[in-house]
Structures are given as structure tokens and as C-alpha cells.
Amino acid sequence: MSKLCIGIICGGRSLEHEISLKSAMCIAQFIDKFRFEAMILWIDKKGCWHLKDIDFNDLSYHKDEKISILLQNCPYPFKFHTKNINILLKFDVIFPVVHGTLGEDGALQGLLCMMNLPFVGSNVLSSSVGMDKDVSKCLLRDAGLSVVPFRTVLAQDQHNIDFDYFVSIFGLPLFVKPSNQGSSIGVSKVTKCKDFNLALIKAFSFSNKILIEPAIIGRELECAVLGNDNPKISVCGEVILSDNNFYTYHDKYVKRKAQIMIPALINDAISDDIRHIALRAFQVLNCSGMARVDVFLNLDNKIFINEVNTLPGFTFDSMYPKLWEVSGLNLQELITKLVELALDLHDKKNCFYHVDGAVLKYFRHERI
């Protein structure tokens, strides 16, 4: 039986470039090499694509083949092409781990759809919606799910933002965050007016749309979702910060200050509620493949959705694979399952595509 060729796309021009490289290295190390042949498609910070062998230690090392995506005279015309060796690369499945802008916001997913390539994760719309906290929270709220209260502010209105107004409706502390960044990039905790103005400048430097939210006093819990039509839900995990602050980019990937508790020490009723909410959120946003749903549990045991991450971190320390490991699915099995889900979803999507003018023929027939 021939192996499937898996293209792991990583890097990119977003602020989460380095996290993406770590995710790719983790997948490359643990992918089932008896079933799959994997190659790395690395996008550097300038947006250039490179082909790398799976046996690597440092993705920043530049011994590689630059590649282009060219139009060819074939039924599905997009192919990966290397400049130095005259071959066309054919991938059976793409595993994208380009976190952040242009990677999990639907841009890369749209390219892969145009290339008719099966890929791991959610489609264009779900990826785009999941990346935009404003839009995703509106959809979740309209579906009857509790989200962290928020107000959205556009860049053109930033000079009319009144600190006292937000304190009157939300109290202190406040959180100010870009609408479309991940890994807590650009997020600030605010306790006074001077900090508020600096937080606005910081958030607007990452996005032209920001969210202002109250602090939810309580616990930060996370749940992993895996599947397409009948998704499975992992056990709940908890992020515990010793200084009672918030889970910053620095805490996640530099200092690694947070303690991760899996499973979370919560009673069965609350655990079941969180898992049900995670499932509903996944379905409301029409996600597929995988997602991580982050919630807050306040002091009254009320659950608020913080965000739905459609392309969660896949590093050795990331919560998503850890949650599944405790739930009985090791990293190799998880990667294999995600590839299988990608192939299954692609087969179903192709049923909706029409070729040879089938739709026009139908309408011509109707008019006769």
C-alpha cells in the first residue's frame, strides 16, 4: 500500500510565525511514517515558499528548495513546482499550521480550496469567522450561548472612546484586545485611565477593530473538539496562573508560567456543561476537523465562551494535543485522525461541484 503524501504548511507572515514552526516540528516528529510521507512547506516572513525535508532540527536553516505555485494544463491546474528540480509535487493532504493572519483566517484555506487539495481543519468561512472575535461572538450569542460581554470599536472611532463609559458598564479591570489576533497578541489588562489609552494604541496597532471586555473573575478552562459531522469532545483542562493575571503570549511560549491541569478539577455537572457548550460552539460556527474552545467559569459557576480557535497550537506543550492525550488519543493517532477527517470532508465537498456545464444544461432543459 503506497503512502499518502502530506504537506505540512508552516511559517507565514503573521506574528505567530515561530509558534507555527514549533507546531510543524511536532507534527513532523509524530506523524505515522509507516502510513504517510511528509514534507514541509515553509513560508518565510517575506511570504516566499520553501520545500524542506521532514528530517530537520531548525526550520530557520536555509538549506532548502524554493518553490512556486504554477498554473499547469491539467484538470486541477494548481501544482507545487520546485525551481531546481523539474518535478511537480502532488500532495494527497495538506496539514496547515500557519497560525494567525493569512493562515487561520480563511486566506490559506481559500487557496487550498482553489487547488482542490484536501486540508486539515475548517473551511474558508468558519476559519474567517473563528479568527474574528467580534463576528464569532455575535454568532455564538445569537445562537443562545453565553459569551464574555464585549463592545466593538472601529479604528475610525478610536478618538471618541470614553474610559468612564466602559468602566460604568463593565467595571474594572478591563481587557482591550485586537479582534483578529491569536495567542493573546496585543491584549492588555487595564486598571486605570492612563493604561487604557496605551492599551488602545497597542490594540489598534494590530487591527483596525478592537474589543473591550470586562474581566471575568474565576477560572480559565479549555476543551478540544475533533470531528466533522459527529465531533467528539475531550476532557476539560484548566490554565492556572500563579499571579492571578492573564494568559499572555509571554506566559504561553516564553516563560511557560502557567500550570496546566488535565483533567480540570471540576465536578461532573460543570464538566458536562462545558463540553456541551464546546460542541454547540463548534457546530454554530460550522467548524470541521478540529477546534479548541476556551471558556471562563466565574465564581457563580456561570460559563462564558471566550473564543473558538479553529487552528489551535500543535506544539509539544500545546493544550489541544494534551487534552486528547488524556482523553485516550495519543499524538500520532490524533494526527492520523485529522488527516482522515480531511479526506472525508473533501470527498463530501466534491459532491457539490458541477463540471461540464451541468447546471446550465439543467436550466436549458427547464426552459424547453
Swiss-Prot record:
Its EC number is 6.3.2.4. Pathway: Cell wall biogenesis; peptidoglycan biosynthesis. Residues 137-340 form the ATP-grasp domain. Mg(2+) 2 binds at residues 307, 309. ATP binds at residues 167-222. One of its GO terms (biological process) is regulation of cell shape. One of its GO terms (molecular function) is D-alanine-D-alanine ligase activity. It comes from the Bacteria. Its cofactor is Mg(2+); Mn(2+). It holds the Pfam family Dala_Dala_lig_N. Mg(2+) 1 binds at residues 294, 307. It catalyses: 2 D-alanine + ATP = D-alanyl-D-alanine + ADP + phosphate + H(+). The keyword Magnesium applies. NCBIfam families: D_ala_D_alaTIGR, PRK01966.1-4. Belongs to the D-alanine--D-alanine ligase family. This is D-alanine--D-alanine ligase. It comes from Blochmanniella pennsylvanica (strain BPEN). The lineage of its organism: Bacteria, Pseudomonadati, Pseudomonadota, Gammaproteobacteria, Enterobacterales. The gene is ddl.
